[in-house]
From Swiss-Prot:
It comes from the Bacteria. The keyword 4Fe-4S does not apply. This is UPF0316 protein Cthe_2213. The chain crosses the membrane at residues 15-37, 44-64, 70-90. It comes from Acetivibrio thermocellus (strain ATCC 27405 / DSM 1237 / JCM 9322 / NBRC 103400 / NCIMB 10682 / NRRL B-4536 / VPI 7372) (Clostridium thermocellum). CDD domains: YitT_C_like_1.
């Protein structure tokens, strides 16, 4: 075992790969943790922070023991960049959080309101004044996973509608679609549970 650790293959290939993948793991966790903090998930963020630092210590300790190995430096930096990208991709797949959509229209507001209401979304309409006259402001609060559907409805009803999308840190009450939970932070753990259960099903077949 000692011979393998001291070999050139370990120092110039295996060790950098271990550092690379360790860095991917800890930066991915860190990226998701920061997103959870911005979403107000105060219970999930500390748990992720614990594992993030634990993996980081393991990676940096190997760097400090091999300061003359420049390949480890590249592996460390490449793992950081890759981990950031992977973390963003995972966060997009999880679609955690609540959004406020504000739509400003000067016509067809009744059709848009009706389409959104029939689709199960809560809608609030406010009269307002625009540069060129009277307009309607339509507000709806949705889950991030529903964004593409709502945008599609808006563009189908009024392709020239002006709309903006903002993050909602906290929402109290409101009308949400049936089956939508406000505690969507647990989807982070349910994602891995689903993959694990699907793997067990394949083994039992």
């Amino acid at each position: 075992m000692e011979g393998i650790v001291n070999s050139g293959l370990f120092n110039w290939l295996i060790l950098p790969l271990l550092i690379f993948f360790s860095r991917i793991i800890d930066v991915t966790i860190g990226t998701i943790r920061i997103i959870f903090v911005s979403r107000g998930k105060k219970y999930l963020a500390p748990v992720l922070g614990f594992f993030e630092v634990l993996v980081w210590i393991m990676a940096i300790s190997q760097i400090m023991q091999n300061l003359n190995n420049f390949v480890c430096y590249f592996a460390y930096a490449a793992g950081f960049a890759t981990g950031t990208f992977v973390g963003i991709i995972i966060e997009e797949k999880l679609a955690i959080g609540t959004l406020v959509i504000r739509v400003i229209v000067d016509k067809n507001e009744c059709e848009l309101k009706e389409r959104l209401s029939k689709s199960g979304f809560g809608v609030t309409v406010v009269d307002a004044k625009g540069k060129n006259g009277d307009v309607k402001i339509i507000y709806t609060i949705i889950k991030r996973k529903e964004l593409q559907e709502v945008v599609r409805i808006i563009e189908e009803c009024n392709s020239k509608a002006f709309y903006s999308i903002e993050d909602a840190r906290k929402v109290n009450q409101g009308i949400f679609r049936t089956g939508t939970s406000n505690h969507d932070g647990t989807r982070f753990f349910n994602l891995f549970r689903i993959h694990r259960m699907s793997g067990l099903d394949k083994k039992t077949r």
